[in-house]
Amino acid sequence: MCIRDRYYTKGAVIVNYKNANHILPDRLVQEIQQYVQGEYIYIPIKDKVMNTSPTEYEQELIKRNEHIYTKSLEGISNSELANMYHLSASSIRRIIIEQRKGYEAMNNKIRQIINEWDIEKKDVKQIYDSAWQIGEDYVLKTYEDVNMLQRNIKILTILEDRGIQVGGIVLTKDRKTYAKDTEYYYILTNKLVGSNITNIHKDTVIVSEMGKVLARLHKAFKECETQDEFWDNSLLKEMNGWIKEVFVKNSWKYIDESAFCNLVDRLEKVYDKLPVQLIHRDVHLGNFLFDNGKFSGYIDFDLSQRNIRIFDLCYFMLGLLSEEEVLDISAEQWFEILKYFFAGYEQEHKLLPEEKQAVPYVMEAIEFLFVAWFMEQNDIKCAEDAMKIYQFVEKNEEMVLKIIDNSTHF
């Protein structure tokens, strides 16, 4: 077996043939012989190898297909998905069918674990990666992280006791708040009426209401803090901690180091002046339900923590940019939503001048968080998308500040 080493000299291709047995370990030669024997193999020069190896490409396809399936569960049509991912409708259908097969074993587990609750046999329908609708009245959610499970249970219980609109926990036959097997933890809650909004940019009243709803949740959270201990977190500490470590480990692949340090410096100057309290931490349209234009309930407190209050506001607005293809939101419409959303929030709960001034910095820091997180997940496409959102906010800092400053006068 030979390996071909090829290089160019004055336009001519010079080929050096070398016996693989003289270069490679016997075990490696035997491994290669399982794929090819008696033929020449070209091994490219290392620095000319494409950045994306076949393995990385396959990982990208896996991530893409997972995203497609998740969005289909969220109600995005096959034709919309085909346009978003530049695939044919038949390809989208094939991907969804394949992904659904992968969840069949989990569906069977759900049907079994439901016996832990004293409810009638119901149809099981997957509605999210980790959530199943049970009949018309319940939602079952799965967890691998018991801390995340207990955090959600704690907050749901406190909010329900205060009359806040959340899906109440249904106790098991043994009067426990959750069930478990060898792999997962399960929590069953009453299903709230309503659904998430998909056309938020077409209704400024709903946008304003969304701001009010978040403000009311923050007020309730503030009152809840005295009833128990909650996870303390800090966006600034994350920036100086694991986020920076990921960027250093990856040689600042997407992020300019000086831009990162400059953002941290600006954030540090104002951070101690920003109010800290219990926040939702995952504010997006899927977690706030509306029924015929009226707010009907909050869901999913898995990530709730004590952090800067404006994190939730910034996170929500950034989420609209990350879903712009689904929601069909232009930059101009996003700025309009920003105005009504902050105006609605401040009708219920005033923001400090320092909070408003920090909004662009917090938005940019959140996107750096997502770039780092997606890099750790080997999700290159989402990491690049997060970087684009950061660049959009950084480019439009003055516009963001101007709109927020004027929102109270709107």
Positions of the model-derived regions?
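ATP/Mg2+ or Mg2+-diphosphate-binding catalytic cores
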Residues: 370-410
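Active-site acidic catalytic loop and adjacent metal/ATP-binding pocket
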Residues: 128-136, 140, 169, 265-311
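ATP-binding pocket architecture of kinase catalytic cores
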Residues: 135-225
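Short, small-residue-biased leader/transition segments that mark boundaries at the very start
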Residues: 1-3
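Short alpha-helical "recognition helix" segments of helix-turn-helix
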Residues: 77-86
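A cross-family kinase active-site recognition segment
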Residues: 201-254, 276
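Short, amphipathic alpha-helical "recognition" segments used to contact nucleic acids or chromatin
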Residues: 59-76
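Active-site activation/catalytic loop segments of kinase-like enzymes and analogous catalytic loops
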Residues: 310-349, 364-381
